Regions:
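Phosphate-handling DNA/RNA-contact segment within nucleic-acid enzymes
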Residues: 1-118, 135-136
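A charged alpha-helical hairpin associated with nucleic-acid processing machineries
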Residues: 28-29, 70-79, 106-122, 128-275
Length: 275
């Protein structure tokens, strides 16, 4: 049941899948325990271990902490997505209850659709190192297709070497929530992350910016947000909005985005795995 059954090792002997681990129950939105995460107490690998997937437990759908956050608030203003269930637990202990974590996977469309059932704003919280930024690009790409009017996606990056667990112990909940309040909106994150690589004041830089941002706009649903993104790109590149709309429409014939940052999850990551 929920992955607590014993397994056989290479010698054929039975053993407890989660032996010598701190257990974190993973609940669905109704509060039913559908899986577990286990954090090892020693230097044994892997550091984190999840229950195997079952008909009730799918990592690509479930969010650790969503049940608890939904119970704590009558109305959830926003949800902060962190990288591990230990982060969720420590933040809650320090008074920050609007946090959830994916279960060792990149955020999926299913995750985001579930989040937006309970709040209109999601804030991705990542470590400030290179791996964190690459994970943010992946979250950005996943978010584009569900950014309809009335929904908000933001990004916050912690100082390099810090994670939610360590930083809230240092600065406390009040200052941590100030960092949350200053999170970067998705539109600004797109332009800031791409513009940083090019001289957007030069013709070449403006051309490159257009080439990279247009495929991202194409992924967005029609609506006010998409229109405003085209307008913002027009101001930054001096291209007419009508021309940008034409170029966005042409992306229908392009099966692959021209913006493909080198996003990956480090093989030495401490994210949970199945076993």
């Amino acid at each position: 049941i929920v992955g607590l059954l014993i397994d056989r090792n290479e010698e054929g002997k039975l053993y407890d899948r989660f032996r010598n681990r701190i257990m974190f129950p993973i609940r669905d939105i109704r509060g039913r325990t559908i899986g577990f995460g286990g954090r090892v107490l020693s230097d044994e690998k892997p550091k984190y271990l999840n229950s195997p997937e079952t008909p009730l437990f799918h990592k690509g759908r479930e969010l650790y902490g969503l049940y608890e956050a939904n119970r704590h608030f009558r109305s959830i203003e926003n949800l902060i997505v962190v990288e591990g269930y230990m982060d969720v637990a420590v933040l809650a202990q320090n008074g920050v209850h609007n946090t959830v974590a994916t279960l060792g996977t990149a955020v999926t469309i299913e995750h985001l659709n579930k989040i937006f059932r309970y709040t209109s704003e999601v804030i991705f919280c990542f470590d400030g190192d290179e791996a964190g930024k690459k994970a943010a690009y992946r979250a950005l790409d996943t978010s584009l297709s569900i950014i309809v009017d009335g929904r908000s996606v933001k990004f916050m990056f912690l100082p390099e070497g810090e994670d939610p667990d360590t930083i809230i112990r240092k600065i406390g909940a009040k200052k941590f929530l100030e960092l949350v309040a200053n999170a970067t909106p998705l539109s600004e994150f797109i332009f800031e992350s791409i513009s940083a690589e090019y001289d957007h004041n030069s013709v070449d830089g403006k051309a490159k910016l257009s080439k990279l941002v247009i495929p991202l706009i194409h992924k967005m649903p029609s609506g006010v947000f998409r229109t405003l993104m085209i307008r913002a790109l027009s101001k930054k590149t001096d291209l007419e909005e009508s021309e940008l709309k034409r170029l966005v429409k042409l992306e229908n014939n392009n099966n692959q985005s021209t913006y493909t940052p080198n996003v990956y999850f480090d093989e030495n990551s401490e994210q949970p795995i199945d076993h």
